[in-house]
Amino acid sequence: PVIFAEYAMDTADACHELGLKTVAVTAGYMHPGPAKEFFAKMDAANVDLKAFTDDFYFKVCGGRLQPVLDTLVYVAHETSCWLEITTLLIPGRNDSDTELEQLAAWCMKELGPDVPLHFSAFHPDYKLLDVTATPKATLQRARRIAMDAGLRYVYTGNVHDRDGGSTHCPGCGRPVIERDWYKI
């Protein structure tokens, strides 16, 4: 986590000395200065794009959307870090067609068609016990919206969806890597 950025960077250095690769799984809410140093040490990053409205980021996360978008653009265009994005879809909170269309259009325009995007299912735990789990159909709808926007590698997660979890050739649509839960 970025809150332990120095520790993560030291750990990344130690991993690299042993020939190991490093992956940062982060909310991406970083000041540009530390982000430069942090992502220079990482081989890959999975950034949580929690929603595509500033209102959600402010009310639910206590932050703002723009710094996360800035981090995504920075990692995609200014580093050698492999980038993937994950959005946890929470029913009624960040899963409207409009928001998903805006998210997909932004990713296509700012990051390009080849940055993988994962839509994960929410499960009611901890503080959001009053919200139902994300239906598989919602994830499939989000995936279709993103693919229709031109994104080539869009996945569903936290549900059993063999097609949505597999990698398909963007040219012919055939499965290249078939995943079934944790089986490849």
Regions found by a protein language model. Name each.
Residues 1-134:
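Conserved AdoMet/S-adenosylmethionine-binding subsite of the radical SAM
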Residues 93-184:
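Auxiliary Fe-S-binding modules of radical SAM enzymes
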